[in-house]
Amino acid sequence: QYDAKGVGLGPGPMGLMGPRGPPGATGPPGSPGFQGPPGEPGEPGQTGPAGSRGPAGPPGKAGEDGHPGKPGRPGERGVVGPQGARGFPGTPGLPGFKGIRGHNGLDGLKGQPGAPGVKGEPGAPGENGTPGQIGARGLPGERGRVGGPGPAGARGSDGSVGPVGPAGPIGSAGPPGFPGAPGPKGEIGPVGNPGPSGPAGPRGEAGLPGVSGPVGPPGNPGANGLAGAKGAAGLPGVAGAPGLPGPRGIPGPVGAAGATGARGIVGEPGPAGSKGESGSKGEPGSAGPQGPPGPSGEEGKRGPNGEAGSAGPAGPPGLRGGPGSRGLPGADGRAGVMGPPGSRGASGPAGVRGPSGDSGRPGEPGVMGPRGLPGSPGNVGPAGKEGPAGLPGIDGRPGPIGPAGARGEPGNIGFPGPKGPAGDPGKNGDKGHAGLAGPRGAPGPDGNNGAQGPPGLQGVQGGKGEQGPAGPPGFQGLPGPSGTAGEAGKPGERGIPGEFGLPGPAGPRGERGPPGQSGAAGPTGPIGSRGPSGPPGPDGNKGEPGVVGAPGTAGPSGPVGLPGERGAAGIPGGKGEKGETGLRGDTGNTGRDGARGAPGAVGAPGPAGATGDRGEAGPAGSAGPAGPRGSPGERGEVGPAGPNGFAGPAGAAGQAGAKGERGTKGPKGENGPVGPTGPVGAAGPAGPNGPPGPAGSRGDGGPPGATGFPGAAGRTGPPGPAGITGPPGPPGAAGKEGLRGPRGDQGPVGRTGETGASGPPGFAGEKGSSGEPGTAGPPGAPGPQGILGPPGILGLPGSRGERGLPGVAGAVGEPGPLGIAGPPGARGPPGAVGSPGVNGAPGEAGRDGNPGSDGPPGRDGLPGHKGERGYPGNAGPVGTAGAPGPQGPLGPAGKHGNRGEPGPAGSVGPVGAVGPRGPSGPQGARGDKGEAGDKGPRGLPGFKGHNGLQGLPGLAGQHGDQGSPGSVGPAGPRGPAGPSGPVGKDGRPGHAGAVGPAGVRGSQGSQGPSGPPGPPGPPGPPGPSGGGYDFGYDGDFYRA
């Protein structure tokens, strides 16, 4: 046994390898040799047949409903136009025709929709189901014969290796020596058949919802959706007290004076008594034709004021009293009380997203053929050629590790087996016990990366947290009062027209203001009997809404009629269907990201292979175009961080996806053992920002329809991406301006595309042989592969000697200085971003998360010009909502592709330095439109205001928890191999670096010289079993 403490002056020259001793009993499986640098990704193998899917775990508990988002601020109440002053009472002279009731004043502009309530945080996703058990790792294939390491010459004080004597009999195992330098990697035994997948473990409980990240900047507000159909008009609210009648528009010419109502009984024309005082001549509502001045009888007693000319026919509808300045908003006819937006029903628990099918669990790599049981370390033969590894015996104490044999060429990475069909999401079976890792075959030369093995099972996606109830839609601005009892509200367009709200009862007519003084009536001829009131003059055309005349001075308002009682609030119309939201251009179909399955548990990272010399970083592939912004999926639970993949240079930032709702943070995956820190890869240059997508043009505003009673506002779905706003249509006749519906909830910002679970940490530099960690679990699914930057130069991992039995972990040697990382290879153009994998079936649409906090409401667009208020025409037919302008093309926010099947996990390269994060791309298009709330009846669209200025984007939300990795894009071209750095001393295992996107695999650098074997460490405890499977095929190394 070595004196581990001997001060070696350095390894003596390596003794000649003696003849291969008889196969010693296999030592415990050596730690798997470092995986050779991953070959360039081969075509993704098809995933092997999906292992049998474990039974589906029980659905995670549905996340609790997220807290209901705060209700968005109610939009400001549209400005209620001042209620037009009640026109002067018509001269009571001949009572003018009873004025036609002017149209209800225009409703004030719709208040801005309240900001959508903050979306409640998504309920916690159901806990990740326990990952189904990874099928038991098949018995490790036999470990290639590990030659018995020749005894290392005794480490002389000068460390010179004495001649290797013949291997004496193995003495009783001394304390485990430090693991010797890894011997050549034995050949990987044949891959055993894949063991059956264990049953999926029960689905874990949904992790608590991650904290919502700050709300991302609100995406650009989507074009205003067409106003949702206004909910059915609630029953008209009680007509608010009749707003003061708008200033009586200038009385149009008095309609032909109807026959003057019987003016109070005109006294018989007495002798033309003194002409009654000529009242001031009211504006002659053309006081009906003065009767021929009869003898000016007394101006008959001014009969009771004729009805206030029933407000005269409102003279011809006076100029539409400037829109009676929208009478005080009648109590919004309580906008039918918007039934409280039903809280967005808690989105039913997103059914627990059934466990996402394990992305069909990548068919488990066939179970590595049984790794033979680790034999006890064979007798240490002379460190002659390594004798064939004896059959693995039971782990004996590691015999002294002989000098590391040359590292065999890394076997080619086998192709991943075909991806099997995704099994139904089973419960993740419990992690099977890691089979004994068979000796890792020597890494073959870097093959091209085989197709990345299937990503680790994506954990069952936690159930999407229930969408918190949507905050109630901002209150719809109060409907302007129904002016005097409005004519029956025109049916809101297209909503289901609520039934016309019952016209609120007209408020009692204000008492007739004292009739304006009658103009001096010429001597009133005998007042002819009041002819039948002429029909109210036809409503003048609804002029362009005249400029709202300044409200005439209000004649003394007749006492305001008592406000009609507020009609019962109309029953809130059922939430009318939300008027169609203008056609929101199609949002790119990003289906809502299916709930992110919880990233499957990342298998424990396999032991970090020795970090080979860093190959030169290959040029980073060019950044692929940012895919269209996916709709914000819910933020999937953060999967456990997989081992760090190579940090590629930061890819060009794609356009930022819409901020997804913050998914609940998935449970933190178990930390894999920290692999030794690999050399820091050069940071790749940040990718360029993707160009912002063009703003869509604004669609034409349709002519405003008549305002129906505002139904309860349906939930506005999140605004779709702004369509191109078409040029505003000519203002329609000003319908009453419907109240501005509340701004729909701001759709959740699409979730930042889930960052895939971090890829497995790159191989840390070779740790002095450490005890053999258990087999590495399958690397977590790599995060979406960033544009692969060049991986740090991956040196060939020095040959890893056979892993001694895991001795007790020897003290970690000082980390050797990192080899000088070769300069990062020029960043190759980022490899094309892989096409998004086939979209997996969209996960259940996550329920809308709680509405994100409202971004500040965009400033209201300038209100469309109010048309001049025309005389109130008869309510014109409800204008059809103008067709929404064509939705402009979404800017290229790429959609998040549906989460492709996670690409096969790339081999873990050394952890490159995390490249700087590329600047965030422009905010991607807003995620998919949330489910439209119930359409309220569609209010007639008011003039379409210009789109308000886009609200400032809210803070960008934190990245959603890492979602399952997107498909790994094709690896960028492999950079040239960098020079091998000097072999560093065994570093202490560094913390796993942040997982960068897997970089393009650099070419394998030359293998650095093997460092001298370190003294064998005490056997380390077996590492956690990972789910990785090493398969060798004839030495080719395939790591699933």
From Swiss-Prot:
Residues 318-327, 459-468, 696-705 have a biased composition (Gly residues). Keywords: Collagen, Extinct organism protein, Extracellular matrix, Glycoprotein, Hydroxylation, Pyrrolidone carboxylic acid, Repeat, Secreted. Glycans are attached at K98. Residues 1-228, 244-1040 are annotated as: Disordered. Pfam families: Collagen. It comes from Mammut americanum. Forms the fibrils of tendon, ligaments and bones. In bones, the fibrils are mineralized with calcium hydroxyapatite. Residues 43-61, 154-175, 251-289, 340-356, 391-410, 434-458, 514-532, 544-560, 590-631, 640-658, 671-686, 706-716, 784-842, 872-884, 902-922, 991-1009 have a biased composition (Low complexity). This protein sequence was reconstructed from 13,800 and 160,000 to 600,000 year old bones. The tryptic peptides required multiple purification steps in order to eliminate contaminants and to increase the concentration of peptidic material. It comes from the Eukaryota. This is Collagen alpha-2(I) chain. Disulfide bonds: none annotated. The modification Allysine is found at K5. Type I collagen is a member of group I collagen (fibrillar forming collagen).
